[in-house]
Amino acid sequence: MLNNPIIQQVLLEILGDDINGFNVLEALTELTEVTDDEISRQLDLKLNTVRKLLYKLYDARLVDYNREKDEETNWYSYTWRATFTKLPGVVKKRMEQLLIDLKEQLEVEENTLFFYCPRCEFKYSFDEAIDYGFRCSQCNGVLKEYNNKNDILMIKNQIKIIEEELALNPLFS
């Protein structure tokens, strides 16, 4: 399941583009239940890094834990495990949100006149361009009208791909 490119993309978003998160997930898959300390040693990662990744995965409901108190030290020990049964739902929800965001972006692109700075390549809406006197806020260069037809086509293509994936992929049935 972790080899699916859509799942990988969603996991990267969840993990903040930290590729070590995949290693943590693989360790959880291989070892079933494991402590953060064991993951840290196995992957040669700082314990703090492993914990941050586990918390991100926990917030996304992709891992779960048990907490046990050591009676001698009064410290808590956490045993983590992957909960991949929730992964398709998490991915589907994120894809549906992405679809909503893309449709909103498409609406803006189709209904707004844009300008850009040829030097900085910053893009401005018509209202922003007026506010700046048709000058770039970064380099003071003269703004030119921006043809966003390619942007619109790209967004429409992304929407089509996501809609098809949601409709056809058995993972999301």
Curated annotation (Swiss-Prot):
Lineage: Archaea, Methanobacteriati, Methanobacteriota, Methanomada group, Methanococci
Keywords, comma-separated and alphabetical: DNA-binding, Transcription, Transcription regulation
Protein family according to the UniProt entry: Belongs to the TFE family.
Protein name in the entry: Transcription factor E
Keyword DNA-binding: yes
NCBIfam families named among the record's database cross-references: PRK06266.1, transcription factor E
Gene: tfe
Molecular-function GO terms, alphabetical: DNA binding
Domain annotation HTH TFE/IIEalpha-type: ranges: 3-88
Comment block on domains: The winged helix domain is involved in binding to DNA in the preinitiation complex.
